[in-house]
């Protein structure tokens, strides 16, 4: 290979079979292949891992002790490596304090901007707060028209209650003759009696002047006198003109509201100097939600209308409730909604000071008398949540609470002082509510004075530069205050990508994992241009990707395969995209060249009257949308990034159905009405969250096939002789498991301020079970051997047991034949976890009344995997069930029976229904971006 290159020899990480490959440096390299073929093993676990390890090795021993020992990847040699940076999808912060602006460091520059050129205003009077010298005050007064009559007033009392007799007397003794009391000029000896219960303003008339040449000295002396009297404040009463207010205190001259010196930390919601004191800078407060406390208002109190007070472990609260109802004559057999407002208020907010006596039965069976003020259900839940030392109680109470915007800062996170500072017409809280697109426009067109411009010039350059990068990777719809925990994997990755471009590093090896996830075809070109820009800076990019456009744009394409798991781990083809397309061995090449394709269905399923209707959807950016989801068909919801797809499907459709069908406590987004729920009895949300939070969860336990496998082992002769039951073969209970590692197979070593380290258990050698259990075999294999089998191997191994084979076959059908039965759930990718969930639903009996919701199921899937997935989804629909998918992938969109296209843009520019209908109908709609990209695909892939 001409030019510098990265040479990998003998890579054996995971399923790689001694891979040798040479990759050109300073190029855009795309690695592709089936899910599980070994792409990530080569890109991340070999090339990136070694680049990172070598960089750490080059640091001092002192620095290395904080970074920990990095294992050398299973590879013979790698030459030509550069320092490596990985941009994957697993590193998004879920911290509620982390926002788009903080992650990209834009917020640091905005804080600096407000600290350096911000202008503080009094939040009560709208007056600019500025500290002025006597000379500045003189100059401003002399700017008034000549012969203007003025009075210099010293405001000694501002809006304060009291009769202030002593103060007025003291002013008279100092020789002052006139006062202005509540806007009336009076003689100091003739001030009327002031009502001590009302607010009053008292100003001393220090001097009366006519503006003309030669008054500078007298004016300055009088100003100094007034400032001394009024502790640094001065009012100039301009006769027949507007009053002027001055202060030398950096305080409001009317009410004294003051702000200290402006500094960046004052605008940080992560600092006590800037955070809102009520919500501590979170912008949200947990409040008791009455809809969660009383989910069914048709129930009576005796039927358990107040859900948190149902008699469970104790009858304390039910007895108290009964006694309260007796005292206040509340009918416990009347539906809650028919109670009077007064009765509801007593139940929810308490009875005031009145004490109530009652006797309740304790857990031990004894009785006890109590006399107490009835605090009400809402204060009770709030108190128990905030004051209980029990984690269990706090968790139970939180089920009846909802996060609402803080009442003090209205969700802006900052203190009153920080929100009183303006640059242009907006404070910092208002600016971060802008979308990236609008923020870019605002900062590019910000009007500043010449002096402020010279101060802010460099800061604005940094802000505009970072915003431009975010805009260029298709994230213009995100608001700067969006919590980073709510970002999709693709969005989070593109944010990190934009941050890296902003750093302008050169000579770096970047390894990226599917940056096109969640991106509409329209925005793909911008992402590809961004990747090329990074390459042109002198960097090498290795991108694991399945997207057609990205593969075609690559300088060098590597196809890993030919299959998945044990059938993969080899480089099938590498070279320019054109070279790979001509390679008959390359599955990717065949799809790229059009020799293989996912064909458009010959017919679309008929849309009947059976449907779920949503009216008045207003969640997030949705603009009062009415939409129908037809049942027993495959519906795909499309639209550019940020157009409102997730708001409609995940926030409203799923949560509203889950609330009605599953009695879920999750509150749906804002909408008016939903109809047609009675036609469904089951809702399944198949998302990409892990199948379990601990290493114990695995595909075998999640799909339920492990129960059947344990039955098989319990039925063996050896197990019967030893008296082993099914439970003996569980690694979750005592008996058959290894007690040294409690059945985990690994031991967790806590490293305190470093991440926890997991090492294989030395007693069972990672097999999870004790020696006696492993002596029981079926067809020559023990239970640990079975857990180490791939799904495909296990399907053949158990082919004579239909119950097990059927469940395993569903995993094969969704393209997961390569994963092992005992693979830790935490190590599965989002796409793999989603397909395990799909498989576990597939082997259950269909009712024809189920609805499946999937959000971008093609994540991590090769086009051949997508072909399999579509067969599975169509199988679900053929059974009479309904599938609703959010998707950008055109291969999925073209096979839909019905499309709902949102847009036209992202963020505020979206939230409306652009078009609905078959793919052919959408393709004819000129207002639909999806239609524009769908049209040529339909023409190309239709069955001839």
Swiss-Prot record:
The keyword Plastid does not apply. Disulfide bonds: none annotated. A zinc finger (C4-type) spans 252-279, 738-764. PROSITE patterns: ABC_TRANSPORTER_1, ABC_TRANSPORTER_2. Residues 309-587, 607-935 form the ABC transporter domain. ATP binds at residues 33-40, 639-646. It is found in: Cytoplasm. GO terms for molecular function: ATP binding; ATP hydrolysis activity; DNA binding; excinuclease ABC activity; zinc ion binding. It holds the Pfam family UvrA_DNA-bind. CDD domains: ABC_UvrA_I, ABC_UvrA_II. GO terms for cellular component: cytoplasm; excinuclease repair complex. The keyword Chaperone does not apply. GO terms for biological process: nucleotide-excision repair; SOS response. Keywords: ATP-binding, Cytoplasm, DNA damage, DNA excision, DNA repair, DNA-binding, Excision nuclease, Metal-binding, Nucleotide-binding, Repeat, SOS response, Zinc, Zinc-finger. Forms a heterotetramer with UvrB during the search for lesions. The UvrABC repair system catalyzes the recognition and processing of DNA lesions. UvrA is an ATPase and a DNA-binding protein. A damage recognition complex composed of 2 UvrA and 2 UvrB subunits scans DNA for abnormalities. When the presence of a lesion has been verified by UvrB, the UvrA molecules dissociate. Belongs to the ABC transporter superfamily. UvrA family. This is UvrABC system protein A. It comes from Staphylococcus epidermidis (strain ATCC 12228 / FDA PCI 1200).
